[in-house]
Amino acid sequence: MLRHILGLAKKHPSLIPLFVFLGTGATGATLYLLRLALFSPDVCWDRNNPEPWNKLGPNDQYKFYSVNVDYDKLKKERPDF
């Protein structure tokens, strides 16, 4: 498969940007799914802990991007379980 793509790139050099953008998009999508699977509190890989979101504190950042929130200055406003 890779030889076929390289052969096409040698025959038609105008396809090289297409292959680069497709590869970049596929790599980005894979890395984003890996980030969601490993660092999201909504995903639980441990069956012994059915509620993993209770371990998160108010100053744990798990959003991908937050604009104006300083997580170090947030106070705890929920009870301990």
Swiss-Prot record:
Which keywords are on file for this protein?
Acetylation, Electron transport, Membrane, Mitochondrion, Mitochondrion inner membrane, Phosphoprotein, Respiratory chain, Transmembrane, Transmembrane helix, Transport
Its annotated compartments are: Mitochondrion inner membrane
Q: Hey, which stretches end up on the Mitochondrial intermembrane side?
A: 38-81
Instruction: Indicate whether Phosphoprotein appears among the record's keywords.
Output: yes
The residue spans the entry assigns to the Mitochondrial matrix side of the membrane are as follows 1-14
**One Gene Ontology MF term:** protein-containing complex binding
Q: Which domain of life is it from?
A: Eukaryota
GO cellular component terms given for this protein = mitochondrial inner membrane; respiratory chain complex IV
In-chain residues carrying the UniProt-annotated modification N6-acetyllysine: 10
Classify the main location. Answer: mitochondrion
**Membrane topology qualifier:** Single-pass membrane protein
Q: Which residues cross the membrane?
A: 15-37
Keyword Manganese assigned: no
Q: Which residues carry this modification: Phosphoserine?
A: 66
Q: Which family does it belong to?
A: Belongs to the complex IV NDUFA4 subunit family.
Quaternary structure, per UniProt, is: Component of the cytochrome c oxidase (complex IV, CIV), a multisubunit enzyme composed of 14 subunits. The complex is composed of a catalytic core of 3 subunits MT-CO1, MT-CO2 and MT-CO3, encoded in the mitochondrial DNA, and 11 supernumerary subunits COX4I, COX5A, COX5B, COX6A, COX6B, COX6C, COX7A, COX7B, COX7C, COX8 and NDUFA4, which are encoded in the nuclear genome.
Task: Sum up the protein's function in the record's words.
Answer: Component of the cytochrome c oxidase, the last enzyme in the mitochondrial electron transport chain which drives oxidative phosphorylation. The respiratory chain contains 3 multisubunit complexes succinate dehydrogenase (complex II, CII), ubiquinol-cytochrome c oxidoreductase (cytochrome b-c1 complex, complex III, CIII) and cytochrome c oxidase (complex IV, CIV), that cooperate to transfer electrons derived from NADH and succinate to molecular oxygen, creating an electrochemical gradient over the inner membrane that drives transmembrane transport and the ATP synthase.
Would you tell me the protein name for this molecule? Cytochrome c oxidase subunit NDUFA4
Q: Which organism is it from?
A: Macaca mulatta (Rhesus macaque)
